[in-house]
Structure formats: structure tokens, C-alpha cells
């Protein structure tokens, strides 16, 4: 600036004090201040580059927060992002996979699941209409997952156990639909290897309100600490279902008022615990 300029053209705060704004990179702030000080009508290429670069990550977090994988989408995803370094998978927080029906995913989907390192919620969805998808027993699920939802008719309880066994931080569990039959010998001690927090919300609906499924949860060595339980079924109340609710007694805050068996509200739907 020339010496004849007024003091208003030379703000001392700009020259002597670092100005910061939360969420905005300092180099962008410095570039803006430099542009104002130069009193130029032309925006530099560096300014445009810095600003556009700063919005990449927030846009990715918004666009890829929830990803639903069906048959055609998997191929497009892998074609667009063949390498981990280029993939926005780490931005995904809610991952939903269609494992049943005519739009079910191809089995190669399981190869890229380990890329979703920050996923918090996993949903497995789909009903009858296609052969059973060959789900591998171990497919590198991110340990960041705290919520698991299974709403399908195309899995066995053993497969669900194998999935849960990969999630040491599992807190919320929702199981609905129906289970495929499996050799009863495979269900002995099915829950003893499971580890998780199990301190959030539990939902059991339909064909999952059955002895083998509830026994699996009761066998978990770390115990059950769910603070909210919702059970929806129309058949007879099972002894293991009562034990399941009682196992959460010390931590239970809310017991769903929609728990019904044969159309009647079961006595323990009025929670005896504070």
C-alpha cells in the first residue's frame, strides 16, 4: 500500500493478529485476507483451488453418509472406485446391503466391505425370490459398527452369529423376518463366543422370537445390558423370552408397551424395574 493511503486501508488487526474461524483452514483465511489487502478484483487460481478443495470432504460426508447396495449399484461403485485410496467408503456411516430378492448384491461385495472403516450402522435386508447368497463366515466387518439390523428371510441363525462375532462394539440389535432352518447341532452353545456391549436397544420381531434366537443372546458371556427392549410376536410367550427380558432387568429403562403374544399384552410389558 502507498504511504498516502488512509489508516482504514491498513487495518492493524490484519497485519498483527492471526484471524481464525472454526472449520475453515487457516490457509484459506490467509488467502482471503491477502486478497482483501491487495484490493484486487481478480480472484487468484490458488484461492479457487483452496476453497474448492476445502469442500470436498464435507460434501463426501453428506453424499455418502448412507449407502444402499443392490445388484446394479455394486458394479457401478466398484467401477467408479476400484482403489481404496479413491473410495469414499470411509465417509459412509450407514451401510445397507440387499442380500435377498432379485436385486440382491453379488458376492464380490464382501471383498470391499473392509474399506468402510467408519461405518456405524449395518443393515442386511431382503426377502424370498432368489437363491441364498453365500455369505462368508468372516468378511472383515469394520469394528466401528455399533448397530446391526437384520430384516430378511434368507439367512440362518449361524450366519447371524458369525456376523455378530465380528462386532465387538455392537450396542443396538434389531432382528426381524424369518430364519432359514439349520442343523440343531450347530446351535449348541451358539452364543458363547459373542462379545459386544449390548447396552442400547434390542428389537425382536416375527420369526426371531424363538427359543434358539433368544438362547443365543442369553449365552453371551458379557451379559445383556440393553436399556430398551421391543418384542413383537403373535405366538405363545416362550420361557426364554421372559428370561431375556429379565436378564436386562438391572439396566432396563424402557420396555416396549407393544409386546404382545396371541393378541394379549404379556404381564412383563408393564416393567417391574425403574
PLM feature spans:
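Secreted/luminal cysteine- and crosslink-motif detector
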Residues: 4-6, 64, 266
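Leucine-rich repeat
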Residues: 74-85, 98-251, 260-271
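Conserved functional hotspot residues or short segments at active or partner-binding sites
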Residues: 254
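PEST-like, low-complexity acidic/proline-rich intrinsically disordered segments
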Residues: 1-21, 31, 216
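Hydrophobic regular-secondary-structure patch
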Residues: 17-108, 112-115, 127, 131
Amino acid at each position: 500500500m502507498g504511504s498516502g493511503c488512509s489508516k482504514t486501508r491498513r487495518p492493524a488487526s490484519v497485519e498483527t493478529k492471526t484471524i481464525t474461524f472454526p472449520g475453515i483452514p487457516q490457509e484459506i483465511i490467509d488467502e482471503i485476507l491477502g486478497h482483501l489487502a491487495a484490493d484486487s478484483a481478480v480472484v487468484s487460481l490458488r484461492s479457487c483451488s483452496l476453497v474448492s478443495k476445502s469442500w470436498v470432504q464435507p460434501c463426501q460426508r453428506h453424499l455418502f453418509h448412507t449407502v444402499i447396495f443392490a445388484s446394479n449399484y455394486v458394479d457401478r461403485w466398484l467401477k467408479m472406485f476400484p482403489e481404496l485410496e479413491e473410495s469414499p467408503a470411509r465417509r459412509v456411516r450407514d451401510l445397507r446391503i440387499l442380500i435377498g430378492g432379485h436385486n440382491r448384491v453379488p458376492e464380490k461385495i464382501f471383498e470391499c466391505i473392509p474399506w468402510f472403516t467408519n461405518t456405524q450402522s449395518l443393515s442386511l435386508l431382503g426377502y424370498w425370490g432368489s437363491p441364498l447368497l453365500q455369505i462368508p463366515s468372516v468378511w472383515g466387518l469394520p469394528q466401528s459398527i455399533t448397530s446391526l439390523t437384520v430384516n430378511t428371510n434368507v439367512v440362518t441363525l449361524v450366519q447371524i452369529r458369525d456376523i455378530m462375532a465380528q462386532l465387538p462394539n455392537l450396542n443396538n440389535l434389531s432382528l426381524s423376518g424369518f430364519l432359514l432352518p439349520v442343523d440343531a447341532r450347530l446351535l449348541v452353545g451358539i452364543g458363547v463366543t459373542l462379545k459386544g456391549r449390548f447396552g442400547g436397544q434390542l428389537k425382536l420381531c416375527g420369526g426371531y422370537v424363538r427359543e434358539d434366537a433368544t438362547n443365543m443372546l442369553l449365552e453371551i458371556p458379557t451379559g445383556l445390558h440393553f436399556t430398551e427392549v421391543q418384542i413383537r410376536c403373535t405366538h405363545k410367550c416362550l420361557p426364554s423370552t421372559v428370561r431375556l427380558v429379565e436378564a436386562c432387568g438391572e439396566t432396563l429403562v424402557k420396555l416396549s408397551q407393544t409386546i404382545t403374544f396371541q393378541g394379549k399384552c404379556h404381564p412383563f410389558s408393564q416393567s417391574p424395574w425403574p
